[in-house]
């Protein structure tokens, strides 16, 4: 295990006057719009939300403050009919509107469910606009469940290839992979809801590191250095319970990711979030970070966050986003932990959130890390917070 040092900082709430970074999230199509709605419902703050759709009726039901009706001339507000070429034409029709709404952003997240008409066709157009504006652009998209048919999967892959050309970083979550982390009682409705939740988690986990200000600050430049021009990214979720919880959580996060064809080995940038109970120790954090970073590039930059959730008993959750791979086809991590499949209840816990998420950044140098970190504490009782994990006592109110 590689050693590293930590420098703690004092807790401080977000202050918009000292963190001027402008983040925007745009959901394209039905899946993207649903994901944006979930983010708003979960209380993701200090982010501007936009939805863009060809289906006017669906657009009107969105709770996003900014709604873009795409392609009135092309679709008459009736949707793209599952045809990406229609979604693309609709976005191109209103490209000036898209540009106006993205203008001024430092970072844009584009979220969509790939395989349909609007999201698949419009997302690459939106990404190209953001690229032309010089905005750091991250795509967070899903691929269809297998039961949705081979045609939809083929369309999704074509759309992803188009999107990849314009985004800096692309996180692709195959919905089918969700079936490996839930139990057999999961309903179809819940499956799609959880797909939306994973999109939300990917966006707010990254955004939270930027918008939450600490005394020793992780600024936009830190995250930009990890995300800019990095291509496909890995997103993994791990869980551990009992005596070996730290090892199990860390290892399962990097060996059972919700992502195809990408492994953590050789990555040059990491975003890591760890959540444990009141008994979560510094040594466990060190153990987790050591397991996760042992296979990354020697010059890797690691931005981490850890949360204390008093409702967790003897449990640890780990989420990892990794970027900067030399190849998409990396050798799999050989060790496989026990109990690395989440139950439906555990996955619901992971999809919730947490109100205490201190974060930090490491620069790996030989066998040690030079660290700068920030701690964040949230005190808002009325809305949820922009971190991976929300307090469990709010879970019941969302179901």
Curated annotation (Swiss-Prot):
Residue ranges with Polar residues bias: 351-368
Keywords from the named record: Cell cycle, Cell division, Cytoplasm, GTP-binding, Nucleotide-binding, Septation
UniProt GO BP: division septum assembly; FtsZ-dependent cytokinesis; protein polymerization
Function summary: Essential cell division protein that forms a contractile ring structure (Z ring) at the future cell division site. The regulation of the ring assembly controls the timing and the location of cell division. One of the functions of the FtsZ ring is to recruit other cell division proteins to the septum to produce a new cell wall between the dividing cells. Binds GTP and shows GTPase activity.
Family named by the database record: Belongs to the FtsZ family.
Domain of life: Bacteria
Region (Disordered): 349-368
PANTHER family the record matches: CELL DIVISION PROTEIN FTSZ-RELATED, MITOCHONDRIAL DIVISION PROTEIN FSZA
Residues annotated for GTP binding in this entry: 30-34, 117-119, 148, 152, 196
GO molecular function per UniProt: GTP binding; GTPase activity
Name recorded for this polypeptide: Cell division protein FtsZ
InterPro entries given in the database record: Cell_div_FtsZ, Cell_div_FtsZ_CS, FtsZ/CetZ, FtsZ_C, Tub_FtsZ_C, Tubulin/FtsZ-like_C, Tubulin/FtsZ_2-layer-sand-dom, Tubulin/FtsZ_GTPase_sf
Compartments reported by the entry: Cytoplasm
Pfam families: FtsZ_C, Tubulin
GO CC aspect terms: cell division site; cytoplasm
